[in-house]
UniProtKB/Swiss-Prot annotation:
Residues 92-126 are annotated as: Disordered. The gene is rpsM. It comes from the Bacteria. SUPFAM superfamilies: S13-like H2TH domain. This is Small ribosomal subunit protein uS13. Located at the top of the head of the 30S subunit, it contacts several helices of the 16S rRNA. In the 70S ribosome it contacts the 23S rRNA (bridge B1a) and protein L5 of the 50S subunit (bridge B1b), connecting the 2 subunits; these bridges are implicated in subunit movement. Contacts the tRNAs in the A and P-sites.
Length: 126
């Protein structure tokens, strides 16, 4: 099993698709890496030679920030926005959409399930 950047790549998938299992590498970057290393994108992970695996591993680790490093950088960026009191930081802190979306309706993904408030109770007749 090929292990690149601490991620076990699925053996039955094409290398091009398997590389996208690494956080920080999408389809475009996967194609770039394969072109740079000269590995055929249609090769299955189980058919990769040891030299191809090491070439891919080296190319990814030297060129891109992936997995834990990238996750921590993103987290630090958000923390910095919150610390300096930027508007985007406030939105993160309150758990609301950050990029200007409407919140009167929608935004349920970011806000979570509705917190229902009891309506007015009907007066009882005497």
């Amino acid at each position: 099993m090929a292990r690149i950047a601490g991620v076990d790549l699925p053996r039955e998938k094409r290398v091009e698709i398997a590389l996208t299992y690494i956080y920080g590498i999408g389809l475009t970057r996967a194609k770039e890496v394969l072109a740079r290393t000269g590995v055929n994108p249609d090769t299955r992970v189980k058919n990769l030679s040891e030299t191809e695996q090491s070439a891919l591993r080296e190319a990814i680790e030297k060129t891109y920030k992936v997995e834990g490093d990238l996750r921590s950088e993103v987290g630090q960026n958000i923390k910095r926005l919150m610390d300096i009191g930027a508007y985007r930081g406030l939105r993160h802190r309150r758990g609301l959409p950050v990029r200007g979306q409407r919140t009167k309706t929608n935004a349920r993904t970011r806000k979570g399930p509705r917190k229902t408030v009891a309506g007015k109770k009907k007066a009882t007749r005497k």
